């Protein structure tokens, strides 16, 4: 199995190194072989090649079974031409790989529930997966910048549009994911106002009735879903959303977990999937050995499950993370009195040993 490693910028190098140690441990235990190809992306690529996504990086990613990304960006590149900002590398590799499905799991364990802004009893045990459509909707519709209309009034517009195939492929992924989890999909829309949402709801309902009768389906308006995530996050299993609603709801859900240092993500298409923590490059702590690698390690677990077909290894990595947290080990961002403070590399080693 070939994995393209994209450490990127800031703490990306440290957290990817820790995650690779865990992946190697899983490969050894479950008897599969991993080959790595390390490439540049983001600011590091700008410094070396003058572009945030060199051709050789994209070529490597396309030839891989999966891509593991650290993080991109930092103040060093704030004043470069907007067309070559580090974040452009991320957008362009997603486009180049044809990634249309973003997965954002949010799980609150008993070891981390106290970090949530919600009451512990409300947050603990929450375990949901947001399935967000990535390539359609208002972000990719027709954009009309501010201009004067025929009446001399300034106006601007952005068009939300989806096609049936776009809805079907993302809904299919959500239903399949639900079959492997709690068997429930909550589809989010604004069908009381938007025509695109009414079509979305119709297609999702048809698919459930025809292809997934074993999966429970309910529909929430996006405003109600945002409220229910706070009131009772444990009611959700798989949350299916369009692009803009998923952008907002996934960030809301991440705050419930209490620490972005624990949250992985995956972006999938028909080829290689890309896996990354949801946090940024944190250049202020880069090189100090204090970054939390657990989100990247849990992204490796997602990679094992969704791209490498190694479900047992994925389960083992997730169990190993829980075991290390249960034993009281924490990186500085999660440390409190009575716990054992460890470095980035030490945390990676502890999880790798727990996998073994």
Predicted segment positions?
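Glycine-rich phosphate/pyrophosphate-binding loop and the adjoining helix
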Residues: 135-136, 141-181, 185-187, 191-193, ...
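Glycine-rich phosphate/nucleotide-binding loop
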Residues: 43-46, 229-329
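Generic secondary-structure signature for well-ordered alpha-helical cores
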Residues: 24, 28-32, 63-66, 95-102, ...
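Buried hydrophobic positions in well-ordered alpha/beta secondary-structure cores of metabolic enzymes
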Residues: 9-12, 65, 131, 174, ...
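N-terminal glycine-rich phosphate/adenylate-binding segment common to multiple enzyme folds
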Residues: 47-157, 244-246
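N-terminal beta-loop-helix "entrance" segment that forms/cooperates
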Residues: 31-55, 227-229
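Short acidic loop-to-helix transition motifs that present clustered carboxylates
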Residues: 42, 111, 220-227
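Glycine-rich phosphate/diphosphate-binding loop of Rossmann-like nucleotide-binding domains
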Residues: 4-21, 26-27, 150-223, 235
């Amino acid at each position: 199995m070939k994995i393209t490693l994209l450490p990127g910028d800031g703490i990306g190098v440290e957290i990817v190194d820790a995650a690779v140690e865990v992946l190697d441990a899983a490969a050894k235990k479950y008897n599969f072989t991993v080959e790595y190809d390390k490439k540049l992306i983001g600011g590091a690529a700008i410094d070396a090649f003058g572009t945030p996504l060199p051709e050789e990086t994209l070529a490597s990613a396309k030839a891989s079974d999966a891509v593991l990304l650290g993080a991109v960006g930092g103040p060093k590149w704030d004043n470069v031409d907007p067309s070559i900002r580090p974040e452009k590398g991320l957008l362009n590799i997603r486009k180049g790989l044809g990634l249309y499905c973003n997965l954002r799991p949010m799980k609150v364990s008993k070891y981390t529930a106290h970090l949530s802004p919600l009451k512990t009893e409300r947050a603990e045990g929450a375990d949901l997966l947001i399935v967000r459509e990535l390539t359609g909707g208002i972000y990719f519709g027709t954009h009309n910048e501010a201009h004067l209309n025929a009446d001399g009034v300034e106006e601007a517009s952005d068009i939300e549009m989806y096609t049936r195939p776009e809805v079907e492929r993302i809904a299919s992924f959500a239903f399949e994911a639900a079959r492997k989890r709690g068997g429930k999909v909550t589809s989010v829309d604004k069908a009381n106002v938007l025509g695109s949402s009414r079509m979305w709801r119709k297609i999702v309902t048809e698919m459930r009735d025809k292809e997934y009768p074993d999966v429970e389906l309910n529909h929430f308006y996006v405003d109600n879903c945002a409220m229910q995530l706070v009131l009772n996050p444990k009611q959700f299993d798989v949350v299916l959303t369009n692009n803009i609603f998923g952008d907002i709801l996934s960030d809301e859900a991440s705050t419930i977990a209490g620490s972005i240092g624990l949250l992985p993500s995956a972006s999938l298409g028909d080829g290689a999937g890309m896996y990354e923590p949801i946090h940024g490059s944190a250049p202020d702590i880069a090189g100090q050995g204090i970054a939390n690698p657990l989100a990247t390690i849990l992204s490796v677990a997602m990679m094992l499950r969704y791209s490498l077909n190694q479900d047992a290894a994925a389960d083992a990595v997730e169990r190993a993370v829980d075991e290390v947290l249960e034993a009281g080990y924490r990186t500085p961002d999660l440390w409190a009195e009575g716990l054992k403070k460890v470095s980035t590399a030490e945390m990676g080693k502890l999880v790798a040993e727990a996998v073994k």
